[in-house]
Amino acid sequence: MMVGGYALPYYGAIRTTLDIDLAVVVRTEEEFGAFSSAAEAAGFMHAVGSFDDHLSMFRASDSGLEVEFWTKLDGVTWDEETLARRTRQQMGGLSIWVISPEDLIVTKLARPDRGVQDEKDVKSVLERLRSSMDREYLLRRAREAGVEALLDVIEGTP
C-alpha cells in the first residue's frame, strides 16, 4: 500500500519526494523473511531493518531508487478496518493501493521525526478533502495515536 509523499497527490498537494514509501502487512518473522527474499529477488538490496523495526529499507541495486517498506506505520493500527479503507488508484498505468486520507493524516502527525513539511501535507489534505473525509474515523484514529490535540491545532491554523 502506498503511503508517504507519493500518496499525498491523491488527497492533497503535489510535491517532490526522494523515496517511495510502501506499507506491507508482515505479522511474523517468517513472513518478514519471505517478504525480504521476494524483494531481493526483485532486485532490491536490503539496506536496513528487521522484523522488529518499524522500517525496513530496500534499494533498487541498478538505479539507486530508494524504496522504504514500512512494516509498522506510525499511528496506524494494522487491522481489517485500515485495509478496508485504503483506496485503489492509478499510477503510471498500474492499479495500486493507497492509504486512506484519514490514515495518511494520522501517520504524518504520529511520526516521531515529524517536521513542518508533514504538517503542511496534513493541511493540504484537510483543505482538499475536509468535507468528504470520515471525520469520526479520523478523530478516533488520531485519539488512538495520541495526536488528536495536534490535529485540532493544525485544523485551527490558516
Positions of the model-derived regions?
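Compositionally biased terminal segments of proteins
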Residues: 1-158
